[in-house]
Amino acid sequence: MTLKELQVGKTATILSVGGNGALRQHFLDMGLIQGTEVTIVKYAPMGDPVEIRIHGYELTIRLEDAGQIEITPAHEPHYKKKEGRQPLGDAQHPGYGEAGIFHEKKTEHPLPENTTLTFALVGNQNCGKTTLFNQLTASNQHVGNFPGVTVDRKDGVIKEHPNTRITDLPGIYSMSPYSSEEIVTREFLLQDKPKGIINIVDATNIERNMYLTMQLMELEIPMVVALNMMDEMRVNGGSVRVNELEAFLGVPVVPISAAKGEGIAELVEHALHVAKYQEAPEEVDFCSAEGQESAVHRCIHAIMHLIEDHAKEAGIPVRFAASKLAENDELVLEKLKLSQNEKELLEHINLQMEEECKVDRSSAVAGMRFNYIQRACEDTVLKPHESRERVRSRKIDQVLTGKYTGIPAFIAIMGLVFWLTFNVIGAFLQDLLQQGIDQVIVACSQALDAAGVNGVLKSLIVDGIFQGVGSVLSFLPIIVTLFFFLSMLEDSGYMARVAFIMDKLLRKIGLSGRSIVPMLIGFGCTVPGVMASRTLSSERDRKMTIMLTPFMSCSAKLPIYAFFTAAFFPGKGAIVMIGLYFFGILMGILTALAMKGTMFKGEPVPFVMELPNYRMPGAKNVGQLLWEKAKDFLQRAFTVIFGATIVIWFLQSFDLHLNMVTDSQTSILATVAGMIAPVFIPLGFGDWRISTALISGFMAKESVVSTLSILFGSTAALTAVINTAGAAALLIFCLLYTPCVAAIASIKRELGGKWAIGVVIFQCVIAWVAAFIVHGIVCLF
């Protein structure tokens, strides 16, 4: 019987995990090992993937992968507690990480006073790592409620300690090279060799989190364990005997609440101490030399003797390297540069372990780790009862991820977001701001006339700067409103459910459900959408997602849509806007289907993800994100757009002999843009001024509107140049043509220059063809 056949609400015990490679290792690292109890929680609305409960937390996997996990309804616990084993009781505080207790003054060897103490902040996804980073550094990194918010390393300085540098690394579950985040984190720890590690552990789910802790301890880097969410642990009736756990692990353990700022000072004190005095974790042998783990014990110690010299030359801790070789880690094996005879001996050692354990090598090592964790938790942790948040989340999920209600709920939520943004809240605030901007422009024009300012200077200030920048600023409310709703959806935990719901549908076009998140973020801005693709473990999926993200209309294009909708489709704003968004999605789907069979052949990455509890988005976090987005928009408005506005005003106001022109058709701009304009004649907008606006849009999409405002002066002048069919085609072209220079730069950073150039050309060709077809269809009516 396989896990795929188990009914909802039923529990079984895992007999074996099939498959091979990095995915199988990832399943083992997540706790899907022989003897573990697993419960089916629910199936996605489309029947796939499935949510399971294991080790006290929820995980989603596909039915295809569940079919490779052998189970039995009648189970025998994989680990049996030793007879006569007594809890440690109320042990005295071991004193790790404290001066004069762990070491003697006369034998200490502190680092020089001017040494910069570097720390790596490491932990599982969604365990409060970025919140702790903000507490430690007083910075304002965005905190989400979706696994994998941190997609790049972020550096900061610990408050009041200028000679420190702490790096917030992407969240990982183990030191196995499954995803790009795990590889980035592992390479940082092995190559950059920070002076200390702050390992943040979710106290409410300590068993799963400690799997990573054990591997970090093998790195022999000074380390402090931060037990986060202890406030939630206490509220739900749980507790941790910190002294006993510290003695068990051999590293300082500090209970904290990153969200409330509790225990941060003590954590910093211990971290600084272990780093300054280079107090590495005490050597702890995780596997017993007796009983069923003796084979693993002998295997790891034999490998340690075999590779000791090679590990030292490669700069890899011997115990860590031995554990990884016992798991068949190819990257570590490559770095050690073993001879052929040594490789054969290594294989013989592993085969001997498999024969004695009756399971494969990866399962044996993973089982050893979880057994040690189970022993530690039995003696030190009183598990909390099911939290109110978990109960509430389950009730909400009955609707938002229900079989018959999940997809309608998603459509309704996204429809409500767009309606409120474009027709209610955003539109109302935009009208208010536009009225204010108009009054400022009139007042400024009158003041300049009264002061007798030169006509050229007045034209620059009023027609160039105020008219151009002001036309863009008026759309700030719409952009902020859209980001507000996207932030609410992410912080609440709903984004993870969207990935769960949409996985089966996205798989039909060659993607994983996790790809929906970068694309949804792309509706706000393409740049973070491209960066968010780093959470995808497959290079194929990552490239494909990045290629499709520009089809998701970013918020910077909203001013263009609103401008043309008001001019050519009055009273139909919501219909046109939603239509454009859906058309972009449709083009993305068609492109994905084409790429699936050509450029990106193969299967999408497996869907393995946690579903976090729902929570109320924090006002501070949402406000911080909105401020960052508003500030970014304003900075672009007064830098890139401001500069582009002045340049366009100059090129439009002067001819090649630098004489001011009365007719802009004789200007420098008309001459240059006139060379490009014929390309757009078949699309119904071959005017040189529109070509100019599209070129300026490559710098920043918002500048399209400011450029048109400067060149045409009024909406009436624009409507006299193009008809409804041309306007529809222009909207489609603006929807699909090349992303802005910032987005292209982010694509270049992720995929390289050739891919970035390819995206520019590809998007422009797609945009031209789609606009040509739309223009022809509209002309028929």
Please report, for each region that a protein language model flagged, where it lies by residue:
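Conserved G1/Walker A P-loop phosphate-binding module
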Residues: 92-174
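Extended, low-charge hydrophobic alpha-helical regions
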Residues: 356, 363-367, 383, 424-465, ...
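Juxtamembrane inter-helical linkers in multi-pass membrane proteins
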Residues: 435, 439-443, 496-524, 601-625, ...
